[in-house]
A protein has these predicted regions:
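Divalent metal-dependent hydrolysis catalytic cores, especially in the metallo-beta-lactamase
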Residues: 57, 73-102, 117-130, 157-169, ...
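Active-site gating loops and adjacent loop-to-helix segments of metal-dependent hydrolytic enzymes
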Residues: 77-88, 130-158, 200-213, 227-237, ...
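His/Asp/Glu-enriched, well-ordered alpha-helical/loop segment
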Residues: 227-240, 256-268, 274-358
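N-terminal metal-binding scaffold of metallo-dependent hydrolase/deaminase domains
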Residues: 1-34, 369, 374
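Alpha-helical scaffold segments that flank or form the walls of functional sites
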Residues: 46, 54, 64-117, 141-156, ...
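Active-site core of metal-dependent hydrolases
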Residues: 155-276
């Protein structure tokens, strides 16, 4: 397959060109065009590396916590329509049995593949979080951080776990963080009431990422910088839900200036109502009302989002002064780095997986390719 005459978005520039895809890989950039090849005309379109969502609970009426392969597969198909080619199905603070069941389904999807976006691994959001920063998690199922409880949750599927969100200030967290690092799992700081010094201690133990910046964490104050201050004061990565609801765009711009775009990932934190009409849904077993693009619990707390990554890219591009290639890095390369797959995903480079998105000047997705296969065309 050849995609010809498109605007190729590299990590540092955008250039007109063509690419050859063979055996699921980017074989050559600017190849000789053979008339016998299957050709996609990319004229007036942009070719981007596929988006990578490291924090997503559901889409299209399906939830990771459904605990079955079918739901993971359906989510993968829905988000592929919006340019996502890899993702981390994200669990909630539910019972150990329910999380274990979901991890098993994620491990199955990782091993056997899906019909849409690739499953790289699981992101466990909880259950080792603070009851004081519960957000839309269920306080009944919070667990004290412990290596034994973590092992009970993942069972034989530790290799399927990519990241875990936890609160570093809670007793037992430091030992668990060290264990996670030793097992090549990314510990992320989130749903945490930590003070600045406690957050810094967690970072020293091995925390290298932070979950949905500004949301469900202690805010910045000039005398107590909190978790936000610790994120800004160190080189750990962070992620933003860039829907204009979770974070004001002025706050987004400030965060990007402080961290630099190489340290920020765009995520959706989407729940099952993503790509569905407004109405009543659930998230991790809790009732959610979706109205005017916002998902909330009955008490008013935000409950994930209905954001897609193409919309996140569009929002950031339209509300900042960053060039398109930098914004795309936030939605692709940075996620690949967190997932430790940046040697084969996250950029357009010869030898890399042909996980690609073609979109127009308004960032409307026209084609999505996963491993060189067209999984969506408008």
């Amino acid at each position: 397959m050849i995609i010809k005459d498109c605007n190729i978005i590299f990590t540092d520039k955008i250039e007109k060109g063509s690419i050859l895809i063979e055996d699921g890989k980017i074989k050559k950039i600017n190849p000789k065009i053979e008339e016998s090849s299957y050709i996609i005309d990319g004229s007036s379109l942009y070719l981007s590396p596929g988006f990578i969502d490291v924090h997503i609970h559901g889409a299209g009426g399906h939830d990771t916590m459904d605990g079955n392969f079918e739901s993971i597969n359906e989510i993968s198909k829905v988000i592929a329509k919006h340019g996502t080619t890899s993702f981390l199905p994200t669990t909630m603070t539910c019972s150990i049995e329910d999380i274990r069941k979901s991890v098993e389904a994620i491990a199955h999807a990782k091993k056997n593949g899906t019909e849409g976006a690739n499953v790289i691994g699981a992101h466990l959001e909880g259950p080792f979080i603070s009851p004081e920063m519960i957000g839309a998690q269920n306080p009944e199922h919070i667990q004290k951080p412990s290596i034994d409880t973590f092992k009970e949750i993942v069972n034989d599927n530790i290799d399927a776990i990519t990241s875990i969100t936890l609160a570093p200030e809670i007793d037992g967290a430091k030992e668990l963080i060290s264990y996670l690092k030793d097992n090549n799992i990314t510990p992320s700081m989130g749903h945490t009431k930590a003070k600045y010094n406690e957050a810094i201690e967690g970072i020293k133990c091995g925390i290298c990422h932070s979950t949905h910046l500004f949301n469900a964490m202690t805010s910045f104050h000039h005398r107590e910088p909190g978790v936000v201050g610790a994120i800004f004061d160190t080189d750990i990565t962070t992620e933003t839900i860039s829907d204009g609801i979770h974070i004001n765009y002025a706050s987004l711009r400030t965060a990007y200036k402080v961290k630099g775009t190489d340290k920020v990932l765009l995520v959706t934190d989407a729940m099952m109502a993503c790509c569905m009409p407004d109405g009543n849904y659930s998230l991790g077993g809790q009732d959610v009302i979706v109205e005017n693009g916002a998902a909330r619990l009955k008490n008013g707390s935000l409950a994930g989002s209905v954001l897609t990554l193409d919309a996140a890219v569009k929002n950031v591009y339209n509300n900042t002064n960053y060039p398109l290639n930098e914004v795309i890095n936030m939605a692709s390369l940075n996620g690949a780095k967190l997932c430790k797959v940046d040697h084969r995903k996250g950029m357009i480079k010869e030898g890399y997986d042909a996980d690609l998105v073609l979109f127009d000047e308004n960032i409307n997705v026209k084609y999505t390719l996963v491993n060189g296969k067209i999984v969506y065309s408008a």
